[in-house]
Amino acid sequence: MAKIYKFLVSVFFLIIYGKIKIGKLRDVKTIDLKYKSIYKFKLYILKKGRIFTDCVTNVAYIQNNQIIPKISYQQNKHYISSIKYNSTLINGTPKFKKYYRGKVLSLVQGASGNNYWHWLFDIVPKIELLNANKILKKIDYFYVPNINQYVVDTFKIFNINKEKLIESQTNKHFEADEIYGLEHLYIKKGAFQKQFKNLPKWIVKFINKKFLKFKKK
């Protein structure tokens, strides 16, 4: 019975939002970012884009019903997987979407973003990249895994109010005028637990410099 219900829901939303296909990076606008004049990254901008997430193993960045590689995230049996395994290619986007006017920076990556360590070493460096490139103040909303106290406190350090935060747990599907996204800074492919050896030294140095001064004595 549960399978039949899930199938009917999938068909219903497929009629509303359409089928998702794999897109190409060349169809997405990018901005080159630098950090300390050494490290280079790309910021992807989706015009009238959508994001769908299950808040566990899949995040889909969608433009014109095409899922965008590199910034989309999918995990299959504890492995970081190819875009072809993203659940939206099979199930579509089975949630009603909300619409946000303005620019939204996405900071979600499945379930790991709910963990404080991952928030600190995976997500916060992305905020700093936009800050260092003078783009952070142009963002209207920030799409985050959850809105708990350490998330709110982090954004206070960057002078960003709680009112600008969008929680993924209650907003699994949304569209915006512009969606900004970065690919994961060091997790690429393979077993999830083996990725942390790739943690860049610049991230560790940045975290120490930015947050140690707030340590309670």
Label for each model-derived stretch:
Residues 1-217:
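The feature primarily captures lumenal catalytic ectodomains
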